[in-house]
């Protein structure tokens, strides 16, 4: 019965919105298999940019790698350690990219070896254009050579930005990177970062494993709400091997409240988004650890069914209810309060595709079972309702035995 129900809810979920005119995100079977091997679930890891910007060096990267092991991040699933912009300074006479010798005196191969020795994967940044966003050498005209170089260094993940590329065709340019990566023979994740300017959800599946859907995130509640709203329209493009990327996490960077960070993390999990920490993981408060290391919320993000959650209730006064079907037949539900006051929100089983009758509800932030609830569709008490703090979230997993 559960398998039949799950098949039905996936069908309803996928057909909830009409196909976009011109949607061409249908990669070949071999491409689907290749991508699924690299990114069967959303990527997890750490990226230097949000916290450190250009203030990076090899000692920092070694300390971050050490911290990701000692603080439990690696065990929780955070695998990739990605160095963003500002690591490169020039090209050698043979055209090869050169890492900053002052900041990275041991070279990238040695640093990759260190990261790999910690049981982590190593990532680097480049740009489609001739220069990166910070004015360092980009990969335009050197795509093949750069991918060979990165493969020789042991790179596992490449983020490719879109600065100085206004006159270029994104599909053509990012395909160059895909083909160059394939020729190296090394499995390397391709992270497409053109900020959603050219509707990547329509063409990026089959080229990269993830693609940005908006401009850069900021450490503010307003930025989170804007990105969540933008990404909510593209859930049909996501799935195993190809993910919408609402950008790196800001959890722990100090610009939001604890409730706002929990909502931020919860919505990223509901949207099956890559979870790339962007804070200083070497020194985290107890609250930051509680958010980033919440195994129950991470499990929603990493669910193998690979469905991006969507909004099923959107109330005009600032409340939303999100749902995400899961591989075991249960449903994750996030009650989000966008308003400035505490709010009561509720859900009926029929609104999230569950059959009527008793269901077990578990709070994923309180880490406790809330008992058995029922919805026979007639009485006020026969639905799950909860109070949600301002700019906060209540996230539950609902499971029926039918």
Label for each model-derived stretch:
Residues 1-4:
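Positively charged n-region of N-terminal signal peptides that target proteins for export
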Residues 7-16:
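Bacterial N-terminal signal peptides
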Residues 22-58, 62, 67:
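N-terminal module-boundary/linker segments of secreted carbohydrate-active enzymes
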Residues 38, 42-48, 77-84, 121-126, ...:
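Structural recognition of the beta-strand scaffold that forms the well-ordered cores
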Residues 64-167:
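Aromatic-lined carbohydrate-binding/catalytic grooves of carbohydrate-active enzymes
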Residues 142-145, 182, 186-280:
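Glycan-recognition surfaces
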Residues 245, 272-341, 357:
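Glycan-recognition and catalytic regions of carbohydrate-active enzymes
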Residues 312-319, 327-402:
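C-terminal beta-sandwich/jelly-roll accessory domains of carbohydrate-active enzymes
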């Amino acid at each position: 019965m559960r398998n039949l129900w799950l098949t039905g809810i996936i069908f309803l979920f996928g057909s909830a919105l009409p196909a976009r005119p011109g949607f061409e995100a249908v990669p070949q079977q071999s491409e689907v298999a290749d991508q699924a091997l690299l990114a069967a679930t959303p990527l997890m890891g750490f990226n230097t940019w949000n916290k450190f910007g250009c203030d990076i060096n090899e000692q920092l990267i070694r300390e971050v790698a050490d911290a990701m092991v000692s603080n439990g991040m690696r065990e929780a699933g955070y695998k990739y350690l990605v160095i963003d912009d500002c690591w490169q300074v020039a090209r050698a006479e043979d055209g090869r990219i050169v890492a900053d010798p002052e900041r990275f005196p041991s070279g990238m191969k040695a640093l990759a070896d260190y990261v790999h020795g910690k049981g982590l994967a190593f990532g680097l940044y480049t740009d489609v254009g001739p220069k990166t966003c910070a004015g360092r050498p980009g990969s335009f005209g050197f795509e093949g050579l750069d991918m060979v170089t990165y493969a020789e260094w042991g790179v596992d993940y490449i983020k490719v930005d879109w600065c100085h590329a206004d006159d270029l065709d994104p599909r053509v340019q990012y395909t160059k990177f895909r083909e160059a990566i394939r020729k190296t023979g090394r499995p390397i994740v391709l992270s497409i970062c053109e900020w959603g300017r050219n509707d990547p959800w329509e063409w990026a599946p089959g080229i990269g494993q993830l693609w940005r859907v908006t401009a850069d995130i900021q450490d503010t509640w307003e930025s989170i709400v804007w990105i969540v709203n933008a990404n909510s329209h593209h859930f049909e493009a996501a799935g195993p091997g190809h993910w919408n990327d609402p950008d790196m996490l800001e959890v722990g960077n100090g610009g939001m409240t604890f409730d706002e960070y929990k909502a931020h993390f919860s919505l990223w999990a509901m949207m099956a988004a890559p979870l790339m920490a962007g804070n200083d993981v070497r020194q985290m408060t107890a609250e930051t650890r509680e958010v980033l290391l919440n195994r129950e919320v991470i499990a929603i993000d990493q669910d193998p069914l690979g469905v991006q959650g969507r909004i099923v209730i959107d109330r005009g006064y600032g409340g939303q209810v999100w749902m995400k079907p899961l591989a075991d037949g249960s449903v994750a539900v996030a009650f989000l309060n966008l308003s400035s006051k505490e709010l009561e929100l509720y859900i009926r089983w029929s609104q999230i595709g569950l059959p009527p009758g008793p269901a077990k509800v578990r709070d994923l932030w309180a880490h406790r079972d809330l008992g058995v609830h029922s919805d026979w569709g007639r009485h006020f008490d026969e639905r799950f309702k909860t109070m949600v703090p301002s700019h906060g979230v209540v996230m539950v997993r609902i499971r029926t035995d039918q």
